[in-house]
Amino acid sequence: MSILYGNYRQKGNTNDIFYFSALAHHRQLIDPDTVPRHKKYLKCLRALGIVYQLSRFKPRETLCRNCHTKYIKHEEKETDVAIAAKLLEVLHLNKCDTIVLLTGDTDLAPAIKTAKTLFPKITIVCLFPYKRHNDELAKLSHTHIKIKAETYTKHQLADPFELPDGTKISKPPSW
């Protein structure tokens, strides 16, 4: 858990780690390895006991402001809602006394406000990905930490990463 907490130390146990993402099927034409690479990463997370939940990308027609050409843009949908729902579920089931959210997404602000109102004794910590500080979430959380670039390098998965069945997954250059 020191990987997530950095310089924030608090006694306690890690009960569950949840990972929320979406498979970018729409990028397959640009980078055919996008989804298979992501699926390999998910296998590694599962092997570490991390529970993942996948959302989706939704295509949306957009108009270029400069040339007025229409194009399709893909937006990740439901991930923030899934995180908010899991946050409230975990708190409702009394599974923890501290929540650590690794995000810079302001869309989670209402869920954090609700969690603090309904469960005032819970400590909420926000970890901000490198260069993704969020003032609103910082104010809402009990404490917040900015993850430094070197933290990512320091806490990479083993390369290769060995799954419980002996399968080895090599780290792609883009990880």
Please provide the spans of the model-predicted regions.
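Domain-level signal for Mg2+-assisted phosphodiester chemistry and nucleotide/NA-binding surfaces
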Residues: 1-73, 123-127
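Nuclease catalytic cores that cleave nucleic-acid phosphodiester bonds
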Residues: 51-175
